[in-house]
Amino acid sequence: MLQKTNRDSQEALQWLSRFLHLDHRRGKEQLSVAGTKDKRAVTVQKVSLQRGRKTLDEVWRMVNHIGQPVSSAPGTRERRTVELATTTRAERGLRIAQLAYADAPLQLGMLAGNQFTITLRNVHWDNEAERLSDKDRSQLSEALEKRVTEIQKDGFVNYFGMQRFGTGAVSTHVIGIAILRGDFNEALRLLLSPEDREDERDESTAPPHVVATRAGRKAYAEGRYEDAHRLFPKICVAERAVLDKMRMPHWHPSDALGAFQNIPRSLRLMYVHAYQSYLWNSLVSERIRRFGAFRCVPGDHVAELDAALDASTAVTVAGEDAETKHSIEEVVMPMPGGDVILPASGWMADMYSELLAKDGLTPSMLSTSRQPEYRLKGSYRRIVQKPRNARCELIPYEDADAPLCETDEEKLLPDVHLSPRAPLDAPFLALQLVFQLPPSSYATILLRELLRMDTSAHTQKELTKNSADQKVASTHSAPAPP
């Protein structure tokens, strides 16, 4: 099991590859996971390693740097011990535990679902005072519990979340369009363009990674690929992988495909799958606009609730008795691809053709790429999803920086514990939500439906920046380290 903190999945696997001294090229394939996890979170998941002759003990010691200097400072003699590794937080925000042998590696999709614990701070009624009375708190708690009950009963529209489309200046699905067109020069341009679109702050106020990214883009634009590779921060996994190929003496600008193919395979496929997700979201929005999200209607595609959804799933078209025969949970929307048949006529066929034409694509181009790995087979996805075992709790707190949820790593460490709960009349309230979702369903979409507010990263950053608890924290504490 791997716990990662504030780490992108690809970046975390790259660090593990380095710790385990895996081959620079093959390391991408020797570590595998069943699914990617959010970056800005503490996440726990299984990771499989093609270990060669390494034992479990050797793997654990290598990842925990047993016997290595505890500091990179010159003259350091102290070495990292097993005791130190089991009593202090793991380095790089990566903790491994519960190692075991397995007969086969993990593959994408080999998971039943995900459990989330999400804590939202400084909760209050919209457009009301942030300091709530006891009566207001009681009413807020009742309202939230009612909303959780409703969303468990009725579900939420199962959109792909914004993280599916990336947080960069160019959405991942736009790069996917270039790939499906076979235009890898355009894909590289979109990925490495030097335009300062991602952050308009000047260098005195922009975060270090933004400044470094700008410098890397500028070096790329000037043809200084070695410098660009060095300047791009390690979180820019795709950009650095492309530049790693470009900086080689034998690479030629005509080989845009070769440079792009140097990106880890799972990341490359993310771009075309993002476009597939964009199409699906668009089609579902139109279906909901026409017919709502609470009933099955004639013409809907339906699949049994326990069916594993892929291109071979047995799907039927609902007839005139749709509303009485099928629940909204059975309704699925095709994920466009070569192995999925979409209606030949009607609103869905018209909209699908219009979306593709706008992007310079045809239906056949989604499944006939010269690169087989980019050929989309298609699948089905339920348009409404219901969370399982959902519950909520309002937690009073005083310190904006105090943890309100214990991580798995903290449960293992003997001297790390949550602080005692704040008194009930503490100035601030946090909402803690716990729920389970099937694979590929997005917690951010559930939150948007539950709270009826914008859950985009930009909006949430602004809310945090301007919240009352942060203002109190800024007057009592020193600036956080970079």
Enumerate the predicted regions with their spans.
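Non-catalytic, substrate/partner-engaging modules appended to enzymatic cores
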Residues: M1-P482
